[in-house]
Amino acid sequence: MTLTIDTSTPESRALLRPDPTVEKKPLIGLSREEMAQALASIGVPERQVNMRVRQLWHWLYVRGVSDFSRMFNISKELRAKLDEHFTIARPEIVEEQISQDGTRKWLLRFPPRGAGRPVEVETVYIPEEDRGTLCISSQVGCTLTCSFCHTGTQKMVRNLTAGEILDQLLIARDRLGDFPDADTPDGAIVPAEGRKITNIVMMGMGEPLYNFENVKQALLVASDGDGLSLSKRRITLSTSGVVPEIYRTGEEIGIMLAISLHAVRDELRNELVPINKKYPLKDLLDACRAYPGLSNARRITFEYVMLKGVNDSLDDARELVRLLKGIPAKINLIPFNPWPGSAYECSDWEQIEKFAELVNRAGYASPIRTPRGRDILAACGQLKSASERMKKTERLKLEAMMIAGHGD
């Protein structure tokens, strides 16, 4: 039986066009296996699939293209078919702010994916002479409500997909001229030589281990040697202490680990970092001691925000040293970054230095983090997107969808 398709009239031809209201499937963030399945689904011959995956991977993650028409070694016919079914477009940049110290913050807008309206996240680039660090978000909002953190005052909206996590890296490389044949913007502060983005830290909005599968997939793509090729030793994931997923992070991703510690006694940490009520200090530190590959060259970073009169006494410093005994560690002391409505103050500089000296004498590196991007609310603990303005009815609708298993 032969099927004949009528293309003689504009109306019949219109029926063959893709429905513009149907979202195209993003290719960014797919694993090689998923990309192969996607290509097979649109009729790419089986014998060609692996070759086409290699070509796409190179164009997306080595060359950094965001338009199928630029993939010159792929036939025009296949490029048209890819464009019909898939998207590799970058998210919208709503705003770009540049701090006096060269720190850059981008507000990015992503599709609703069940949230009722588009959502926004913030991504921050911190340049130094010998490195450029990109701080990436994993969620829109956060569930943890840490009392000193601005992001924690924004209710959870949704998880980011693996592609949306990677999009933040791709956007930053676009804007900094970090792909081949691209130009660095005039006046941009970037490392003296080599890559503009040398390190990424999962320290933006959200708790990455509450979005484990998407974060895992994004970081495995980012560290793939045939693409973006970031060393796993230059990727750090920061968690407030989701203990079961700390074990999984070490086994399944193998990147560097940072712990948002901030207190040395359960009573205070319960207040500052409420997840401590579920995973107290002993359980958290046991997971740290078991993290694979620990050595003096591969240490866990413990982040400790300095809050005046709250957690900054020398007794706190001594207890910190005692708690971390036997863990190859570095302790980042973070001067508290103020934000509107916060109930805390930053410790006096003299007290921070005394705290650091005591910890350092015990054998732990204890750098005091230089505040970056404070003037554009891009510093640690200051990120909060405009998605917080989502109407209550829209948020409740999203929460119902997530409970039902339809949200991302």
From Swiss-Prot:
Which residues participate directly in catalysis? 122 (proton acceptor), 380 (s-methylcysteine intermediate)
A GO term from the CC aspect: cytoplasm
Q: Which keywords has UniProt assigned to this entry? A: 4Fe-4S, Cytoplasm, Disulfide bond, Iron, Iron-sulfur, Metal-binding, Methyltransferase, rRNA processing, S-adenosyl-L-methionine, Transferase, tRNA processing
User: Can you provide one Gene Ontology molecular function annotated for this UniProt record?
Assistant: tRNA binding
Provide the GO biological process annotations.
rRNA base methylation; tRNA methylation
Stated family: Belongs to the radical SAM superfamily. RlmN family.
Name of the protein this chain belongs to: Dual-specificity RNA methyltransferase RlmN
Species: Chelativorans sp. (strain BNC1)
Gene encoding this chain?
A: rlmN
